[in-house]
């Protein structure tokens, strides 16, 4: 059932286990949906434009999110120039966003990241507390009642000082205004592996967790910076480490650490309960982020019954209409983000990968080898045709963002077809002296060279189509 916008959680109304008007209760949360759930504009790179933010607010309402967290890393007044007031034109834009959020029943949460140069102690610390309160006061007058102060991605690890700063700002803000809602933070050690060693809190996390008031909601990113899935057991360990229920800043579909690949899959399986808040960090390409964000909304509304694959298929159908089948074939090859420290998102092209593995294990005379060959050929052709249609029919703004990946999909599909033909030609060497086999091998090598030349700008289906083509090229 899609009319989730009529099911609004009664946050700020004193509901046990939810985000209360006076702060955040830290009792275990058993309710479904997740009480505070939404999108955090928290990526590095070019921030969203006003039109994109207005669009995402409407999207939040339609999909059942109830919060948008403003925290663009490359907004200078959010981070480097955090003490300075916003220029009038930017302040007008923020005011328009706050007004639009209220119209959409979406909570606008305003965040500042002062950690690069904030003073936490002494007179300078007092001055910076007043600077932060002044910054928040301007936004409060625009209608903002929910705030955040983040200390992520900085070198200094003064846990006690940060906790004191947060406590003072939260307390003074609430004393000034009785209608302040949530007050959130992200610590400097913001994922589980960095918070502890052998299950024992590291000094920073120990000081921060011990000193922080329980009316400040802590967000963390899970087991790693970008590592999925996240189990209930893993969340329970993090909660126990902090002695409170932690909220989740989930780094998918954000791809600012590997922009050559788009995150077009569903959100990984996540905990089924005891989560007070969740925010999904998107890509800088707002429109293409919506597939994953819609699945995140499905999870946040009903964690117990979230089905990633089903949610993903339904999101694509809703968003792409007559192009849904084509988009699903393309997006299937662009779901998982993986490097030496990140591993998040479901596997790329699982059907293609499984069929390719079966084919190479059994070719040429094993059971089902010929059927696998025919199936893989059909899959390659379908992906080429789908990418071709999308190149012609996608909306211009989306096409601009994913053209390199679509073109790489066409290259990979063509190379897959050549690889399949090469497998057949290898069985006919006795008949033609290997002429066709040599010709196809040369063609495949040229196609692989073209694929490699474009990997610096576009990655897709690396461990499915890409792996199959390379495996066949090495095969003798």
Specify the residue positions occupied by each region the protein language model found.
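Mature N-terminal, pre-catalytic/accessory segment of carbohydrate-active enzymes
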Residues: 2-8, 14, 19, 23-74, ...
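Aromatic-lined carbohydrate-binding surfaces of glycoside hydrolases
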Residues: 37-218
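Catalytic-core regions of glycoside hydrolase
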Residues: 42-43, 154-313
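A diffuse structural propensity rather than consistent per-protein peaks
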Residues: 49, 87, 230-231, 368
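Hydrophobic alpha-helical scaffolding
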Residues: 87, 122, 159, 228, ...
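Conserved short hydrophobic patches within well-ordered secondary structure
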Residues: 139, 149, 296, 413-416
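C-terminal functional modules
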Residues: 304-476
